[in-house]
């Protein structure tokens, strides 16, 4: 019995479903017997209603004799599929008096259930088994315990509930992939590890559990890294000056692992744990058990400086380096996720995207006086990879000595975003839309702009905050589902035409205005027959649609492609509410309280100097200083606002015996002077910060002039 090579079988159709697809997870193994010119999908053969396995496993195809297969194909050729209306429907619903027949792929399409056990029964969409819950106390979405995507806890074909754990819900696709990988020996409830009850219910609901060993058991040294204890602090603000990986047993800097997953950790001091015996759960596990009531009973360890925030905000931690596998149908469930109580925080989403960043570093040579062109050259370099960690070195153009000095990545990204906001690629005052710049289009700058925005967000840069709601909605919902408004029109002449048309009070006035603007309306294809005054509204809608959306269609598509870098656009479309806050709105104004909590003390503090520091922040907020909160943050970090993904490393304060403050933007460190009086402290701080920022601006202007 010669079997064709796998590559050859792809061109042959299954004798039952007539499909060429070779997809083992969906249709089972595709096998071809050259001797009898026969190709079948395993599931198509197994689920056919008129055939039985009369031979041994090695006989025929999986124990199904060739003559029996021929008879079944002949029987099915007389039956019409009730889905695709073609002959060859070999599978029938087993419900009494139900005469529906269908192909296996068609049955999957119509959400039929195939039971891979017993008599291998098949049920159509009207008679398929369902899961029944006596009462539904789930008012909020719950996560699938495999992929962690949020789902509505209502049993359906695509959503299944564990029979042994009331809070365990799954996507059907997630369960099927899990079953194929785990096999009959390891497929069990992800919460309680029950095997018997769980497998019986899943078989009843049409999950195929193959009789084989788990895939990881067949792989040498699989999951070897799990044999190592996890030792890293993942809380949002680690207070250990030795770093997140530091672990000192029997001290406050000992790493405590999550009691649920063991794949996330915290220093005892960073989560206010008094002893190692205290329980602690990571953010992901705490969110899963919240609705079960266990979360409310557990002792809450709130992160420092987290007053007046919601329950999910106060528990925001830096995600551990484990990425949940996305289910195949996850994108279609985004709307369900948006209605969830656990709306994702944008900083957490960006931190997740940041897991793509590798340890390998790429150094960018940036000329601060020509930030755009030097950034463009760096990002277009064939050796540049967006997933590499970025290191910045500042250089001076036409410097014969070739000198360079270390630069702040966040300062560079902040300057780049400022330039982008004021560039000719966008138009508008505060809320901006894409402009139509033929030269920029020719040079592919819209793509580069989108790419820069994506890189900035993932690598810890500032939030743009200048998108109009129209541009944002086009990115999320598509231009065809977005209606521009008058504020989106930055061209004064076009805006005046729209205003005149919209304020016309009679049909005669409206026709007169259209005659005056005839050439323009004809050029943009918006001429229409006017019969009533209400026709002006459709005309205005057409003009707005052309000027704001259709006119810039090509730049928009290019910009959109750039935003796909590192998966940013997909995240924006999945969590529009979260990203709207940073793309369409400027960050909140800084205050003395925010800066005081932002900077942590990493060295032995001088109590007097720290008191002066807090008094100075309050004086700046009250307008009693020549500097601003933004000036202080720029001086220390290079950024005028807190990036959505947070600072790395966390901004810190040092008290040194120096006369003037020193800002280290590469390390986000501010050294404050130790002085005898507060007056001297404020004068030295004001003088240094004000003049340092002024000199930096003058240097940039000087280089630009040359």
From Swiss-Prot:
What is one cellular component GO term in this UniProt entry? intracellular membrane-bounded organelle
Induction of the gene:
Up-regulated approximately 4-fold in G2 when compared to S phase. Down-regulated approximately 3-fold by gamma-irradiation.
Q: List locations, semicolon-separated.
A: Nucleus, Nucleolus; Cytoplasm
SMART domains registered for this protein in UniProt: HECTc, PHD
Keywords, alphabetical:
Apoptosis, Cytoplasm, Developmental protein, Metal-binding, Nucleus, Repeat, Transferase, Ubl conjugation pathway, Zinc, Zinc-finger
Which pathway does it take part in? Protein modification; protein ubiquitination
**Tissue specificity annotation:** Predominantly expressed in brain, liver, kidney, testes and ovary.
Q: Does the keyword Zinc apply?
A: yes
Mark the C2HC pre-PHD-type zinc finger spans by residue number. 11-51
Q: Which InterPro entries match?
A: EPHD (IPR034732), HECT_dom (IPR000569), Hect_E3_ubiquitin_ligase (IPR035983), PHD-type_Zinc_Finger (IPR051188), PHF7/G2E3_ePHD (IPR042013), PHF7/G2E3_PHD (IPR042012), Zinc_finger_PHD-type_CS (IPR019786), Znf_FYVE_PHD (IPR011011)
List the CDD domains: ePHD_PHF7_G2E3_like (cd15669), PHD_PHF7_G2E3_like (cd15496)
Q: What is known of its domains?
A: Ubiquitin ligase activity is mediated by two distinct domains, PHD-type zinc fingers 2 and 3. The use of these distinct domains may allow ubiquitination of different targets by each domain. The HECT domain is catalytically inactive and does not contribute to this activity.
Q: What is this protein called?
A: G2/M phase-specific E3 ubiquitin-protein ligase
